[in-house]
Amino acid sequence: MLKILINAYACSPNMGSEPGMAWNWVSNLAKYCEVHIITEGEFQDKIEDVVPKLEQGKNMHFYYN
């Protein structure tokens, strides 16, 4: 499986604009690839609430700055 590293300063499953766009990218890429995402710690709670509920969540690995 292809592995991808993404540095997304803002990434959040329940926001629009930059955080929402980054979430759209990583969640869709994770359907086909193993994705490692570096993002800000302020989004950690929101991300960790949603990722386990997603089928592709097993392919999404977050690292917080």
Give residue ranges: language-model regions.
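N-terminal subdomain of nucleotide-sugar transferases
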Residues: 1-58
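A short, charged, and often flexible helix/loop element on the N-terminal side
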Residues: 58-65
